[in-house]
Amino acid sequence: TVSELAATADGMAEVVRPALEMLVGRSFTDAGKVAWEKLEGADANGIRRTDGMVRNATHGEEVAVTLLEPDARQGDVVIWLGDRGRGSLTDADGRPVAAVARLLAAGTAVVGMDLFRQAEDPPARNRAVREDREAAAYTYGYNHPLLAQRTHDVLTVLAALRTGQVGDLGRPRR
């Protein structure tokens, strides 16, 4: 079974990882050439907030990113994926939600991102072709599914983090 294969290093390397890469349409090593652009930053209550964009030149993609860093940062970084994208990091008053606040208090930086079609005002429906011969094959046959596109966004941000491009984080220790 898949769970038995995933429990071994050989099973992961030979079966599970290639299967996931096939489903997603991209591997970590194929994430592409990425660049970080800082858009704005602010410090408040011992937390530095940096908003920026990670651009993937190889695949023509960009991901909006928010980085929250505590003043007493210990070096770890958590990637925070939520239903509201970067908005999942904070409450309506702009304060970090409880779980994010605990991470920051422990000295951990937190990175949130707006995944594909996850911005504050996502479209109400999937796009459709405006012709008599509408066919889902044109939308879904030529494009990766939503899960794969969002996974591409995570891989793009991971690539930027691993190269030390996001904020002032530097290269990871591991």
Show the residue positions of the predicted features.
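Gly/Ala-rich beta-loop-alpha elbow adjacent to hydrolase catalytic centers
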Residues: R174
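Non-catalytic accessory segments flanking enzyme active sites
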Residues: T1-L67, A148, T156
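Soluble catalytic regions of membrane-associated enzymes that act on cell-envelope
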Residues: P70
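Cap/lid segment of the alpha/beta-hydrolase catalytic domain
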Residues: R73-G170
